[in-house]
Amino acid sequence: MKKFFAVFIFVVGALSAQAATNQYLYKVTLVQAAPGKLLELIDLYKARATAYQAAGDEAPMWMRHSQGDHWDLLILFPLGSYTEYYHPERVAKRKKADESLAASSEKFKGDIAWQEDLFAYGPALADLRQAFANGAYFHVEMFVALPGKFADLYQEREMENAYAKALGEPQNFIFVRDQGAAWDLFTIGVFRDLKHYAQSADVPVQEQEKAAKAAGFESPGQIGPYLRRFISTHHDTLAVAIR
């Protein structure tokens, strides 16, 4: 019984921490372009973003696949909350913007081979914008948790952030699914460039060991195996900024 309550308290605590740090709503769109249509699709999204900004929406943040998963674009649309985004006035303005873009709607359909959408709660918009403004290289990890293991997965992501912080590396932004695609949680690490992303390999082994143990891991080599205890699916992608 004591063990049960200890686990219960841990799970509640982890979920409460999640609720406190992931309060901003985003729509996340993953897109694979039809063959030969990627650049045209990027231009279409840029035109739509300009029209939506004029209608009062926040500018999206996005990236282009370099290697890893099969999507070409990951687009983060800042919503704030469902109440804000679906306010009748906002909806009417977006509808008017869509009408001005009617000529491009068929092009969108022809340029997209695959699309997946997810509504997720994530970090404060100002923090994410600052990171994207200073970074041009991204590491995206997307997860489906094993049944009953979501809180453990979330805690593991925070442990990896503690490890990164101790080594002076960027911490991952954590996003938690609300509805849509199957991903329970995904993280985005933002780096200046490929060299910045790879510089952790230059950290002395002793410092890595110390940071890993301080974060709650047995050793740096056990970070991956520890993560795998909690997940059924894990996709890794490296991506670059779209300006």
Describe the function of each predicted region.
Residues F8-I9, P147:
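A periodicity- and composition-biased signal for non-globular, repetitive helical segments
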Residues I9-Q18:
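Hydrophobic h-region of N-terminal signal peptides that target proteins for export
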Residues Q18-R243:
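Short S/T/G/P-rich N-terminal loop/turn motif that feeds into the first structured element of a domain
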Residues M1-F4:
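Positively charged n-region of N-terminal signal peptides that target proteins for export
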